[in-house]
Design a protein with these regions (language model features):
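Catalytic cores of histone-lysine modification enzymes
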Residues: 1-82
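C-terminal SET catalytic tail plus cysteine-rich post-SET Zn-binding segment of SAM-dependent SET-domain
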Residues: 75-182
Length: 182
């Protein structure tokens, strides 16, 4: 199958087909060294660009090398990934014309501070490469963080109010003691 790497309007470089691809075909394998997620996190902590692909339960990662690592994300993809016998294949979802850029939905699942902005330009673009499940998880975590911040602020305000009341009470008590000593 003829594939080539060239400039992409989605992101830097992309993978394009030079021949027609039928629906349901194994287009290319996602290859590279397999490392643990912890090793990948440490190795790529400060790297703005990675070609990592989580497999199995997500504890193992393929550090992408080869043609498949240039396949960009799209919210309206023409391919999908499938794990078969421990190997990751990019499969065509529909017939793909020669010259068309290959894409699949990354469905990122382990978000951090990065918003993983999507630039696919699809009509149904969700503006991020995170999966719907990860988006929901991040929103829930953000709400919990906001609730904790509000609760902490409320506790601090209550403590300040209590301290002011305690201070006044102590002052009145000291004034009474002084008055009775005379």
């Amino acid at each position: 199958m003829g594939l080539m790497i060239r400039s992409s309007s989605i992101h830097a470089a992309g993978c394009y087909t030079t021949s027609r691809i039928a629906k349901g075909v194994q287009v290319v394998e996602y290859t590279g060294p397999r490392i643990t997620k912890q090793e990948a996190d440490a190795r790529f902590r400060n790297s703005p660009t990675t070609y990592l692909f989580g497999i199995g339960d997500g504890s193992t990662v393929i550090d992408g090398h080869g043609t498949a690592m240039y396949i960009n994300h799209s919210c309206d993809p023409n391919c999908e990934t499938e794990e078969l016998d421990g190997r990751v294949w990019v499969m065509s979802l529909r017939a793909i014309a020669p010259g068309e850029e290959l894409t699949y939905d990354y469905n990122l699942y382990d978000g951090d501070e990065d918003d993983a902005r999507c630039h696919c330009g699809a009509r149904n673009c969700r503006q991020t490469m995170y999966s719907s499940e990860e988006i929901a998880r991040q929103k829930k975590a953000l709400k919990q963080k906001a609730r904790r911040a509000v609760e902490a602020k409320r506790r601090k305000a209550a403590a300040v109010t209590q301290a002011k009341k305690g201070g006044k009470a102590a002052s009145r008590s000291n004034a009474r003691k002084k008055a009775t000593r005379r």
